[in-house]
């Protein structure tokens, strides 16, 4: 059955789409349509959504549904009444929890919404509309560029695409992006930031070396509103329980 469905090695090495004539494109389209129909005939029910926890993982959070009731303690460590509006930087217990996970101090943590991607989008939108650090809003500039270690996370790149930001690819190696190239690029004042997934980088799984982290922290960009988007999404998502087999990226704040 697999031989009838999947593209053969010969097809995988086919001519690139841009080099095909109309006849070749029609022939390929017909073949792919036939493969699609064979997939449909299998009657599979597959959820192809990315990043969804399994039922077993969801079970881990079940006790959270029972930990708050009318008899629970509703005062935070600093006396904040958790039934009321929150405090700007977040509850101290939450800041301490995240600080421990990210190897930083609670004072370096601000609790925002539950979606880091939404926070990153909003930060770019704020830079676009009002500017950062008192600088000109990016929307009023002739050109805005972002450094994009590649391969990288497509949702980062989609944010740039949404705002019309020019993306500059920089090769991602096993120890992180090419710092020497980044140092050269940030001499351009139009370069406003860089996307980074520093630990188990999506999609290759690379972790930035200490040398790379220090190099990024020491950047002297021409743009005073240059920002490093340090999307450490996999800080606690280790593949192995054995600590000796786990990666721990250097704390860029230090």
Annotate each PLM feature.
Residues 10, 35-38, 136-139:
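Short boundary motifs at domain starts and secondary-structure transition points
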Residues 232:
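Walker B catalytic acidic pair
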């Amino acid at each position: 059955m697999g031989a009838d469905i999947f593209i053969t090695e010969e097809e995988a090495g086919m001519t690139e789409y841009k080099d095909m004539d109309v006849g070749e494109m029609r022939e390929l389209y017909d073949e792919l349509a036939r493969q699609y129909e064979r997939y449909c005939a299998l009657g599979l029910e597959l959820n192809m959504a990315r990043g969804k926890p399994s039922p077993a993982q969801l079970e881990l959070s079940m006790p959270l549904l029972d930990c708050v009731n009318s008899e629970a303690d509703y005062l935070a460590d600093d006396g904040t009444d958790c039934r009321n509006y929150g405090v700007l930087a977040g509850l101290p217990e939450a800041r301490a929890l995240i600080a421990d996970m990210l190897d930083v101090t609670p004072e370096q943590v601000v609790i925002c919404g539950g979606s880091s991607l939404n926070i990153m989008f909003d930060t770019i939108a704020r830079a676009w509309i009002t500017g950062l650090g008192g600088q000109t809003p990016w929307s009023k500039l002739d050109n805005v560029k972002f450094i994009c270690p590649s391969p990288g996370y497509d949702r980062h790149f989609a944010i740039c695409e949404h705002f019309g930001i020019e993306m500059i690819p920089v090769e991602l190696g096993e120890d992180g992006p090419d710092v020497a190239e980044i140092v050269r690029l940030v001499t351009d004042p139009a370069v406003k930031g860089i996307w980074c997934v520093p630990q188990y980088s999506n999609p290759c799984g690379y972790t930035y070396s200490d040398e790379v982290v220090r190099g990024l922290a020491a950047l002297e960009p021409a743009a005073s509103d240059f920002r490093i988007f340090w999307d450490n999404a996999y800080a606690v998502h280790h593949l192995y329980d054995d600590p000796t087999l786990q990666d721990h990226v250097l704390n860029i704040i230090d």
